[in-house]
Amino acid sequence: MMRCPRQFMPFVTFCTNLRPVTGLPRFRFSIRWENGIIMMKYDSLFLQWIIFRQKPKIGGANMKNKEADTELESRLLEILVHPCRIEDIRRELPNAGKNNLKNALDALIADGRVMKNKKNRFAVSAHYGCAAGTYLATERAFAFVAPDYPEGEAKPDDLFIPPNASGGAWHGDRVLVKVSERKNNRGRKEATVIRVLGRAGKELTGELVQRGKAFFVQPTSKKYPEIAVDKHDLGEAAVGDCVAVSISHYGDEQFMPQGVVRVDLGESGTMEAAIAAVLHENGVYDVFPNEVLEQALAIPQEVDMGTAGKRLDLRDKLIFTIDGDDAKDFDDAVSLEKLENGHYLLGVHIADVSHYVTPDSPLDAEAFRRGTSVYFPGHVVPMLPFALSNGICSLNPKVDRLAFSALMEVDKDGRRYGAKFAKSVICSKARMTYNKVNKILAGDKGLREEYAFLVETAETMNNLAHALYKRRIERGALELDIPEAEIRVDENGKPVEIRFRERGESEKLIEEFMLQANEAVAEYMCKRELPTVYRVHENPDPDKLRVFASFARPFGYRIDPSKPEDTAQFQTVLRGAKNDPKQRVLPTLLLRSLARARYADECIGHYGLKAKFYLHFTSPIRRYPDLVAHRMLQKALLGEEFTAADETMCEEAADQSTNREQAADNCERDIDKLYIASYMQQFIGEEFDAEVSGVQSFGVFVALENGCEGLIRAELMTGDFYQYDEEHMAMVGRHTGKRFTIGTPMRVKLLAASDTTGQIDFAPADGSLPVSEKLDRPRREDTDRAPRGNRAERRRHSGKGRGGKPGKGKKPPTRKRR
């Protein structure tokens, strides 16, 4: 329970004094801080007290205090390896100051890293047999806790939490647990939750139901308990609706959890409500606040050179965009000129969003909150209002647009000799698509005549892109060219085709050019030690590489997990997988072994790209880190002084952007599942060729040749009793020894597909099983899903959105395996 700040006490006293007035038998309230407002619930009574609305001050003093606090906490953790009294700690740290020491100890205790025993002795939690971590509920009575561990160390095994040992924790909460000295009969360490350190979230989605005169919300995920709702807190929701409920009381031995309906998401059991629930769960909102829309609509839709400032005029240059057929926001354009010394001037021209979205404006605050645009079939939830993203910021053809240009000198072999950056004004000569450029490069006569003015440039660009790619691979970059399913929808939003997204020459061309710009800007900022937001990718976990090495060994590969920096060994695997269908699972397994890329305020390099310097610069319309990179680069070019506030802003932007990217990925993945399930409903009862894509104790995941993935439950696997071999990630027959592991081919029958949960069920085709539209099994959750790696890094590091050919109608996803 958090301590009430002193300035809130008058309000708490006021609430407490309400009890005799209302006649309520017991005082119980929840407290929530949001945008400078204290939200407190006194049973069904809501009160608001505005404390302040101004932003907290940030500056050098705060930065120094933060660093000092971190240093003090580190010293305390070193001292408290053995139990100490407060007097002993003060003797060890005589200059710490009484208040600073108390605050540091309180922070460590609140975070679960330090504990105090009954004798008032402090020590690290591990000394008392305790550990802090994340509570991972299951759809049964038991759970697990993933313990915290220092960066760079091997991940410890999850701790098993038996029934009735949850301590009131909910899925995703941070908890402190007491670890048992003995292991259970499955060899797992057990633990008991002794304290909830922090709650994961305040809102859930589910169906509103009524039993008698009482109302409840049954959460979409069975990992959460049922929540009681007072009849006065239903809002406009009706029984049977899908709703978002905020938790006002998490429940205890006497009371069940209680909540308040916040949003009615539509009729439960419909795909529309399911999509709305996914968006809400991930904090993705389609509607912009009025003040944001007003600011966006007030921006002129034509370039005003009078207010554009001093700029490099590139309007006479051959500059054009290349995007997908259905793209609406064009945030990057390219150009290429031959220089007198035989080198090329490669131009990457990015929409100058920072000219229109200024710091601390409503537009900026909303862009920071959203962090990124979210894409799903036939729809986009933009980071910026369409007046900007599809209007004045979009590099539309044959109109003047403000840009931020990266002009790089490269030779025919892809060596970069230098780069210059400038605010510019451009006029795109053509809106090209990937399909058109691919056909031009393939020799399409009609298109080559129509776009004769850029054919030679496009061909030279393609040759340069090949040279850049070759140099990138030679330095050790990993080319994880893993097919990604593409869902095509009709004009009504109904899925009509699922297929793998194609990557032609033009897609690769744009990717290479965007990578060059991103690296050039990162190098410029990092070498000058200037603050910005970088895109970083750490070395993989050796334990995960050991698992990958065991899978690669039967194919003749010898992987040394202790040398992750030697990416040549992984490149050998990737080359072999391209030429052997039996090995095509290996790139996916390698991807799952890698760390997830993230944003940071420090330049530590990008492992997958083998780049010493890297950030995101090329998509400011749809990514907030790119917008920050633009602002910081412009400040550097103008020679302005950077402050501690800039450093703080970059750190906050990096953390927020990483979190919002993860939310966007979750959103896109879960909504794609709904569309795929909707599409597959027409094929229930049919058989398909498939391949095992993941193995868990409850069954095997299989993927069809169009990318659709579903589950075969263990009890439906016929011919033997199958047991899970966790070490080798395999399902093994007890009597026959038959093994199902990742990559095993199967013939499967589709049993069920739900467009409200996204779950798809298969069975082995040789089994005689009834076919139904629904199976009574729990919904598959993130912790149960076969991992798919860092989807965002596969799709976004190039700076491009989604593209692809238009759908050609419904196609069954079967074809003979070659």
Which residue stretches match the model-derived regions?
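Charge-lined substrate channels and their catalytic hotspots, especially those that engage the 3′ end
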Residues: G36-G347, S354-D400, N438-K439, A730-M731, ...
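Electropositive polyanion-binding surfaces
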Residues: P10, R91, V239, A244, ...
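A short macromolecule-binding patch
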Residues: E153-I161, Y224-V229, C708-Y724, S772-K774
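Internal insertion modules embedded within essential enzymes
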Residues: G206, Q254, L751-A765
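A generic structural signal for residues embedded in beta-strands
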Residues: V177, V245, V695, V748-L750
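Intrinsically disordered, low-complexity linker and terminal regions at domain boundaries
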Residues: R713-T756, I760, E773-E781, R785
